[in-house]
């Protein structure tokens, strides 16, 4: 439902937050849009929080994010793999408690198509600021409706799928859902690790035309952990851009694109 962001984060979602902050700030008070949550971004967050009578801790959490996106017409879509009994009522419940309505996926064959169809049904054109996948993972692999099993056919994302034209073409149907400064995140364990993880995020960035981020280490769920990454991450950008270059390219579009 929201990304948990604080000083030190370097993410496409920070870029989105900076754009939204600039929309709310007075002329002359705007901050650089670079994806780097540094001192000036924290100061801008505190200023925004004080102006909106929020807890001025300099952290973007549930309430601050809700205030930033109010009236913007933007969507955060979460999809959660609950194929394991232990996963039910965990991250999916965290998202509900934060006011979200996650797409919940139980163990099934062919889950990949089912999940993507649900995203297409829920997403609105040009309005998704964050698409986030929760579940089990491994380097270059993200479970969608598999739990920890590896023998459920077509129920996961894997780097090898980008060799298949049919998969790329089907996945590309999601691209029009994203707003100009949208992104996709994979919160499975070590999905971004190694060469397989590099191929994985690069494949998504190329096909979806938005940044793709995955954790390189073990990821946790529960409470705030459901809404943030643990440890090192890997992000790929469309056209091979850097975070700074991609962020700069979105700054002007972000000022112009207000969704009602």
List each model region and its residues.
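Catalytic cores of nucleophile-dependent amide-cleaving enzymes
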Residues: 133-134, 139-223
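Extended, structured, electrostatic nucleic-acid-contact surfaces
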Residues: 21-32, 43-56
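Caspase-like cysteine protease fold
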Residues: 214-260
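A domain-level signal for caspase-like cysteine endopeptidase catalytic cores
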Residues: 73-123
């Amino acid at each position: 439902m929201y990304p948990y962001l604080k000083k030190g984060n370097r993410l496409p979602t920070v870029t989105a937050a900076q754009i939204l902050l600039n929309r709310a700030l007075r002329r002359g008070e705007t901050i650089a849009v670079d994806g780097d949550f540094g001192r000036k971004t924290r100061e801008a967050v505190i200023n925004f929080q004080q102006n909106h009578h929020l807890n001025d801790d300099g952290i973007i959490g549930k309430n601050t994010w809700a205030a930033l996106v109010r009236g913007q017409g933007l969507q955060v879509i979460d999809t959660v793999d609950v194929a394991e009994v232990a996963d039910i009522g965990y991250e999916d419940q965290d998202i509900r408690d934060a006011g979200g309505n996650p797409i919940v996926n139980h163990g099934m064959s062919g889950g990949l198509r089912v999940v993507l169809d649900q995203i297409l049904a829920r997403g609105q054109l040009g309005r998704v600021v964050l698409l986030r996948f929760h579940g089990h993972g491994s380097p270059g692999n993200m479970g969608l409706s598999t739990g920890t099993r590896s023998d459920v056919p077509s129920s996961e994302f894997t780097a090898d799928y980008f060799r298949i034209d049919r998969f790329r073409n089907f996945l590309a149907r999601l691209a029009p859902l994203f707003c100009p400064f949208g992104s996709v995140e994979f919160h499975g364990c070590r999905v971004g690790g190694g060469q397989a993880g590099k191929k994985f995020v690069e494949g998504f960035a190329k096909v979806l035309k938005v940044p793709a981020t995955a954790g390189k280490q073990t990821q946790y769920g529960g409470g705030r952990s459901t809404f943030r990454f643990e440890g090192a991450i890997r992000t790929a950008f469309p056209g091979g851009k850097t975070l700074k270059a991609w962020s700069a390219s979105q700054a002007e579009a972000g000022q112009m694109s207000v969704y009602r």
